[in-house]
């Protein structure tokens, strides 16, 4: 799940327990047998209380974060990459699932790092697993929040080639927007910076060995990603529309009508079709703010419709049925073309 409430990896690491001397080992062993501690990997434990009282997605997030931290703590010469490093950068990753990937020196003797299954009582939180270790010449890297990670372009390239395609697309959209300091209010300069960022990512991708996994996916994702997507939801909708072969799509389309300036999330300007993603959790902190926000949005919609725009609204729940969203857009296209 993508959620701002997910803890940082730094916070998760601070909660982990390691046996640093003999008396501590005995105490930890007793706590593990009693269920007060759960073992993440050999020599790395998490207090069970850290998981109690949370929804399953957050429990999975904490366990996955603990595994990432365990890899960093156990293998000091390894460099986290892909979605793990994206978490540290603040990209909109799905925190409760996904591979744990790291680069290791070619001379590294150990290839595998196994993780224990995690249970609270009889409830399985996460099955046993292992890290994906890539032995290679280590990329240039940095220390961020105490973790060794590559620089942003390499992280984004690895996300683009190793993550599931829809997630890879969303991460690359967010990454290019970040590299370009994208602003809807300065679109010309922002688009130029975004194209330079895209060029840099493609160059980084081309520098990888030919045998690297996922390079074809990464090339497609980087070539089609759009910095104008302001949320993972918008990115997922755009990804589905592109796969459906729909042409002439823009993001953050600037529209002037009745003395107002509006930005449409995803648009087909030639047909005046507006696809608006409602990703907000709430509209305000008071009843008055909620009413004012809803009234402003309704007036915005009326003005766009008076200017000839057909508006298709999409909510988070619709992302489970993207085929229906695409079908709705295709119907709107046929209706507009056939007028």
Language model segments and positions:
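Short gly/ser-rich loop at a beta-strand->alpha-helix junction or flexible surface loop bordering the NTP-binding
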Residues: 1-212, 339
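Surface segments flanking catalytic/ligand-binding clefts of nucleic-acid enzymes
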Residues: 1-11, 18-26, 183, 188-339
């Amino acid at each position: 799940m993508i959620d701002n409430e997910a803890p940082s990896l730094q916070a998760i690491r601070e909660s982990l327990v390691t046996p640093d001397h003999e008396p501590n080992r005995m105490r930890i062993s007793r706590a593990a047998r009693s269920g007060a501690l759960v073992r993440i990997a050999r020599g790395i434990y998490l207090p069970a209380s850290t998981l109690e009282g949370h929804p399953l997605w957050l429990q999975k997030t904490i366990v996955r974060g603990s595994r990432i931290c365990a890899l960093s703590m156990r293998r000091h010469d390894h460099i986290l990459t892909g979605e793990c490093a994206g978490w540290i950068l603040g990209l909109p990753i799905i925190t409760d699932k996904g591979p744990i990937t790291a680069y290791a020196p070619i001379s590294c003797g150990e290839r595998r790092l196994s993780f224990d299954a995690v249970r609270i009582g009889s409830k399985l939180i996460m099955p046993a697993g292992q890290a994906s270790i890539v032995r290679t010449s280590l990329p240039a890297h940095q220390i961020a929040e105490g973790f060794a990670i590559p620089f942003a372009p390499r992280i984004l390239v690895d996300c683009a080639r190793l993550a599931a395609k829809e997630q890879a697309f969303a991460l690359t959209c967010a990454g290019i927007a970040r590299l370009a300091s994208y602003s809807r209010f300065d679109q010309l300069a922002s688009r130029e910076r975004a194209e330079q960022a895209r060029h840099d990512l493609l160059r980084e991708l081309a520098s990888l060995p030919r045998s690297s996994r996922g390079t074809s996916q990464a090339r497609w994702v980087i070539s089609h990603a759009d910095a104008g997507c302001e949320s993972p939801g918008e990115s997922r909708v755009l990804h589905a529309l592109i796969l459906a072969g729909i042409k002439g799509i823009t993001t953050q389309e600037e529209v002037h009508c009745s003395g107002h300036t509006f930005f449409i999330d995803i648009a087909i300007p030639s047909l005046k079709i507006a696809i608006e993603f409602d990703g907000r959790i709430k509209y305000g902190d008071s009843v008055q703010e909620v009413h004012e926000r809803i009234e402003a949005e309704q007036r915005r919609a009326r003005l766009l419709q008076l200017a000839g725009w057909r508006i298709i609204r999409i909510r988070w729940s619709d992302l489970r049925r993207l085929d229906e969203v695409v079908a709705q857009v295709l119907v709107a296209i046929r209706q507009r073309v056939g007028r």
